[in-house]
């Protein structure tokens, strides 16, 4: 994951550190 506080490019802003993150993370 990109790091705590970052999110995936998903409508729901899934946490990057979640195993559900499969989209490029945004800062």
Swiss-Prot record:
GO terms for cellular component: extracellular region. One of its GO terms (molecular function) is toxin activity. Disulfide bonds join 1-17, 8-21, 16-25. Keywords: Disulfide bond, Ion channel impairing toxin, Knottin, Neurotoxin, Secreted, Toxin, Voltage-gated sodium channel impairing toxin. Transmembrane segments: none annotated. Signal peptide: none annotated. Expressed by the venom duct, in the proximal part (indicative of a defensive role). Coiled coil: none annotated. The keyword Lipid biosynthesis does not apply. It is found in: Secreted. The keyword Iron-sulfur does not apply. Its main location: secreted. Belongs to the conotoxin O1 superfamily. The cysteine framework is VI/VII (C-C-CC-C-C). This toxin activates voltage-gated sodium channels (Nav1.3/SCN3A (EC(50)=3.98 nM), Nav1.4/SCN4A (EC(50)=4.99 nM), Nav1.6/SCN8A (EC(50)=1.27 nM) and Nav1.7/SCN9A (EC(50)=2.42 nM)). It shifts the voltage-dependence of activation to more hyperpolarized potentials but has only little effect on channel inactivation. In vivo, it induces nocifensive or pain-like behaviors in mice when injected intraplantarly. This is coherent with the specific defensive role deduced from its proximal position in the venom gland. This is Delta-conotoxin SuVIA. It comes from Conus suturatus. The lineage of its organism: Eukaryota, Metazoa, Spiralia, Lophotrochozoa, Mollusca.
